[in-house]
Amino acid sequence: MTDFFAGIPQIRYEGEGSSNEFAFRHYNPDEVILGKRMEDHLRFAVAWWHSFAWPGGDPFGGQTFDRPWFGDTLDLAKLKADVAFEMFDILGAPFFCFHDADIRPEGATFAESKRNLEEIVDHIGTRMEGSKTKLLWGTANLFSHRRFMSGAATNPDPDVFAWSAATVKGCMDATMKLGGANYVLWGGREGYETLLNTDLTREAENAGRFLQMVVDYKHKIGFQGTILIEPKPQEPSKHQYDYDVATVYGFLKRFGLEKEVKLNIEQGHAILAGHSFEHELALAASLGILGSIDMNRNDYQSGWDTDQFPHNHPEMALAYYEILRAGGFTTGGTNFDAKIRRQSLDPEDLVLAHVGGMDTCARALKAAARLYEDGSLETARAARYAGWETPEAQAMLASSLEEIEARVLAEGINPKPRSGRQERLENLWNRFV
């Protein structure tokens, strides 16, 4: 035991009437919703990087947090892991996520970094034996170190490609050893700053081959989890190749990987791409590639990707409605890719941020489930497209332009516009949130 969270009680569900800030008001893990426990619907995960590795810096200032585990030794990395599992237990968090650089110190060589990762993974595995918390997904940090400034899989230097591939192999091994449900790839540096020095074709082909290697290795080692790509349009690159759901799907189709890889979709990244979160989720579900989500929010005034904890449950309810429509999570879940503000220095702030985020998502899920169970929205949606269920409409889809023209002329088809009833449906939605 450490003393970092000393005095903070285990968070329990007390209901909406509770005034205890260290209690859940909406998140009741055992509450059954649509035939499934709330915990199994939401599958919450704590992000190792924002919660335990981020020093509190921003583009205009450095570290504000003073954590006892900050440093570059394995002993401090193990202390960080011990503190992390204490918070997981306080929250009752079912999952966590990590990058390799979050959990192990950087070595002077690749071999040393590999040994460090293996040792800390053994330590984390020991901690997991005494905890209910499991690994939702692991990933490799291929963007922070200066070697990745021009990308990893898309780097013009073959040696960086090699280093990156070897790093991913080690992280996949670590993820499998810890029983991870997924493995994530995020291409923060897989993009460009200027076309003046960029070969788009080569970079795309190298990225495609890299991903094929990842999929091949997954099957070789017998990893039963899902490979996930996380889209983002920019930050840190000016233009990233995994821009949004549609772009990534085109990339997967190009390299024959659309049946092998799904997506980890982040709320903040969807906003950066000019979409709503629910749009990206609905499109991914339509394409059969919805895997998992990162839950956070941006600053809507500045437009920055601020990775704040969610607190707007009506907005989140739209997202969870699309997840319910898609059948819910299988291997995926709700990872809080969110960080407390750099002025929030106290251990209590870190715990309460997760309490608020978990309650917000639980409240959103309950609202989405009520509407989904009611069925009114789906009835209205089906009625709008009912004409396509007729034999004539189905036959038209199997015919030709010439045949359709002949039918329009013969039957004097002259369609009249029909209301989309948007305001009615918005009012319906508001009744449930």
Curated annotation (Swiss-Prot):
SUPFAM superfamilies, per the entry: Xylose isomerase-like
Cofactor: Mg(2+)
Catalytic activity: alpha-D-xylose = alpha-D-xylulofuranose
Main location as per UniProt: cytoplasm
InterPro entries found in the cross-reference section: Xyl_isomerase-like_sf, Xylose_isom_bac, Xylose_isomerase
Subcellular location: Cytoplasm
EC number: 5.3.1.5
Biological process terms in GO annotation: D-xylose metabolic process
Class of the enzyme per the UniProt entry, highest EC level: isomerase
Cofactor notes: Binds 2 magnesium ions per subunit.
Family stated for the protein in its record: Belongs to the xylose isomerase family.
HAMAP family, sorted: Xylose_isom_A
PANTHER family: PTHR48408, XYLOSE ISOMERASE
Self-association state and partner proteins as the record states: Homotetramer.
Protein name: Xylose isomerase
Taxonomic source organism: Cereibacter sphaeroides (strain KD131 / KCTC 12085)
